[in-house]
Amino acid sequence: MAAVAVAVREDSGSGMKAELPPGPGAVGREMTKEEKLQLRKEKKQQKKKRKEEKGAEPETGSAVSAAQCQVGPTRELPESGIQLGTPREKVPAGRSKAELRAERRAKQEAERALKQARKGEQGGPPPKASPSTAGETPSGVKRLPEYPQVDDLLLRRLVKKPERQQVPTRKDYGSKVSLFSHLPQYSRQNSLTQFMSIPSSVIHPAMVRLGLQYSQGLVSGSNARCIALLRALQQVIQDYTTPPNEELSRDLVNKLKPYMSFLTQCRPLSASMHNAIKFLNKEITSVGSSKREEEAKSELRAAIDRYVQEKIVLAAQAISRFAYQKISNGDVILVYGCSSLVSRILQEAWTEGRRFRVVVVDSRPWLEGRHTLRSLVHAGVPASYLLIPAASYVLPEVSKVLLGAHALLANGSVMSRVGTAQLALVARAHNVPVLVCCETYKFCERVQTDAFVSNELDDPDDLQCKRGEHVALANWQNHASLRLLNLVYDVTPPELVDLVITELGMIPCSSVPVVLRVKSSDQ
């Protein structure tokens, strides 16, 4: 039986196998010597050719990089990773990643320059700066824009919302500091109700009266503003009548929305007022459709009374008892501005027999500390009065700082009357503990690290100081380079606050998220 002979030879350099297929007459015989020599010669030529190609590829790659950097306006660049003159041949493995990145970057810059040159030839607009260099200084440091970027669409929506609700809009003052140009600023001289017809208006008269009191500063303070709002809402609920084919739980909520927009036009709502409105809306939506109207209205008014009693009155009593433990005989306590809660704590501690002295620090333009000074002197508490620039001179003899709060944010920051952060910082420099007294209904889920993003701007005309017939800063609007900033609140970081006294107990600022989580689970 004849066997088929196949010659197989392995090349140690290439690792490939060569196989000579049998010819027409090669079946049953071995390869001749001449055939083996011819096969060995062909293999050597192929191996030499591969070595020459490997040595020529790096030179070709460097030529590609040089050609890409000097590309003209009419030359098309080859794709990255493809060698010139070869169909879809990959970049050799000898190239480093840095060289490949530099090559791609040079290609992109060349293509960008080519596009800009074509636009210039067509008479188009001048080319814009590339995203990589826009807003950068020659040193490579990015700079923030000079003016804050405000979304025009959002502003139009905010303006149209009161118009849809038939709420009069208040004219903005216009002359503002550029850093706070995104915040509304109103003048008390521009009346919101000047062209408002009360009989034909959708705004309840109680809300109109409350809004005017807010705008003129007749009702100030977080607790006083919140209580006044809830009392006005009780009057609104008392006068409310459910329309035909409507449910109280739905119609009343919609009826309150223009009222809140009107109050916001008068003065931005505080965090405590937002929480009270959220509570009332929840109570309204939980009213069953089977209840009679008078019964439902009576329950809502009772819920408002219960909210005021539990969240404000009883909470103040509990905070006063906790704060009493932190006041010792012979203390020198520094307070700032006018906080109804802090004033109550000091008066009750004096009535209980603790003997101490109070330093009242005040600041323009409100000078609210005078109200605190009158109440303390009337109660027999020894007190002294000074302005905030002189606070650093009395802090060496102060034993503790007792402050109120407008709101306590979710990140532990304290939002309070402007100047509070300054006092807390100076107190930390003198190693004086800072205690903040705040009810938990002022806790909010908003997070804020500075006073620039969200704040309130008061009337800048209040900064004018009148001494006799002379008025400082008179006609300041006529000076184009002059702007007045009357900031209402500032934000104190939690690192400057040693303790927060609430009706739940004495907690650190880091426990604010825990309190918010417990409150949300209870609701």
From Swiss-Prot:
GO terms for molecular function: guanyl-nucleotide exchange factor activity; translation initiation factor activity; translation initiation factor binding. The modification N-acetylalanine is found at residue 2. It comes from the Eukaryota. Pfam families: IF-2B. Signal peptide: none annotated. The modification Phosphothreonine is found at residue 86. GO terms for biological process: cytoplasmic translational initiation; myelination; oligodendrocyte development; ovarian follicle development; regulation of translation; response to glucose; response to heat; response to peptide hormone. The modification Phosphoserine is found at residues 12, 130. Residues 170-179 are annotated as: May bind the chemical integrated stress response (ISR) inhibitor ISRIB. Its main location: cytoplasm. Residues 1-147 are annotated as: Disordered. Residues 30-40, 87-121 have a biased composition (Basic and acidic residues). It is linked to Leukoencephalopathy with vanishing white matter 4: An autosomal recessive brain disease characterized by neurological features including progressive cerebellar ataxia, spasticity, and cognitive deficits. Brain imaging shows abnormal white matter that vanishes over time and is replaced by cerebrospinal fluid. Disease severity ranges from fatal infantile forms to adult forms without neurological deterioration. The disease is progressive with, in most individuals, additional episodes of rapid deterioration following febrile infections or minor head trauma. Component of the translation initiation factor 2B (eIF2B) complex which is a heterodecamer of two sets of five different subunits: alpha, beta, gamma, delta and epsilon. Subunits alpha, beta and delta comprise a regulatory subcomplex and subunits epsilon and gamma comprise a catalytic subcomplex. Within the complex, the hexameric regulatory complex resides at the center, with the two heterodimeric catalytic subcomplexes bound on opposite sides. Acts as a component of the translation initiation factor 2B (eIF2B) complex, which catalyzes the exchange of GDP for GTP on eukaryotic initiation factor 2 (eIF2) gamma subunit. Its guanine nucleotide exchange factor activity is repressed when bound to eIF2 complex phosphorylated on the alpha subunit, thereby limiting the amount of methionyl-initiator methionine tRNA available to the ribosome and consequently global translation is repressed. This is Translation initiation factor eIF2B subunit delta. It comes from Homo sapiens. The gene is EIF2B4.
